[in-house]
């Protein structure tokens, strides 16, 4: 009798362990899936909902000495599943312009994305407020943060961070861009302002 009870207890433990491992495995698979993503520095017409949301916007960030960089840009990347890994499956780029502390232009050109360093998907954006989305499926808008390695046409290199804090985003994500260009750190993200068409970004999960 005791032997039978022991066998039943052992079987119950095995079944419980199997169920736990199955749940953990499913959660890991869900959080570690490969994502095909489009990113954009957007134009939000009127600087408020419903927009529309168009490609071709601009966003700025400042360096500690008061100088500023303004970027346009868009592209795609494939974010591999698991461990927030990087990828060379990237496209896109944009334009850049730098300004001194007084606001005078000091240079301009283009840049190209060469690598995805990391992408952290936060969540899909909430359906309200409603937007007209002229880029991709409005229901596939996403919040999160992408870190991209970029090559400037003047020979300098940089690391571009694109943050999207749209409707329904959890706290802690900035909205806009931050980048390096050579040794210079343009890390003072210029936030969007209501009614102003600037300093906004978006991700779309393509699949």
Give residue ranges: language-model regions.
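Predominantly extracellular/secreted and cell-surface proteins with exposed
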Residues: 61-161
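N-terminal segment immediately downstream of the Sec signal-peptide cleavage site
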Residues: 28-105, 186-207
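A eukaryote-biased signal for long
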Residues: 155-207
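Bacterial N-terminal signal peptides
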Residues: 12-24
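Bacterial N-terminal signal peptides that target proteins for export
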Residues: 2-15
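Alpha-helical segments embedded in low-complexity/disordered contexts
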Residues: 8, 25-29
């Amino acid at each position: 009798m005791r032997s039978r009870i022991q066998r039943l207890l052992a079987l119950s433990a095995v079944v419980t362990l199997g169920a736990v491992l199955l749940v953990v495995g499913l959660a890991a698979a869900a959080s570690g899936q490969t994502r095909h993503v489009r990113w954009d520095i957007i134009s939000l017409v009127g600087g408020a909902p419903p927009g529309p949301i168009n490609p071709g916007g601009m966003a700025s960030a400042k360096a500690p000495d008061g100088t500023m960089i303004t970027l346009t840009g868009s592209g795609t990347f494939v974010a591999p599943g698991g461990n927030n890994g990087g990828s060379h499956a990237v496209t896109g780029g944009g334009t850049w312009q730098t300004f001194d502390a007084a606001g005078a232009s000091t240079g301009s050109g283009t840049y190209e994305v060469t690598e995805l360093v990391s992408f952290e998907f936060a969540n899909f954006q909430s359906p309200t407020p409603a937007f007209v989305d002229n880029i991709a499926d409005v229901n596939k808008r996403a919040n999160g943060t992408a870190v991209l390695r970029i090559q400037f046409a003047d020979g300098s290199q940089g690391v571009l961070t694109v943050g999207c804090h749209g409707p329904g985003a959890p706290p802690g994500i900035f909205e806009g861009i931050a980048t390096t260009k050579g040794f210079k750190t343009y890390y003072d993200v210029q936030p969007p302002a209501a009614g102003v068409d600037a300093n906004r970004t978006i991700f779309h999960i393509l699949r």
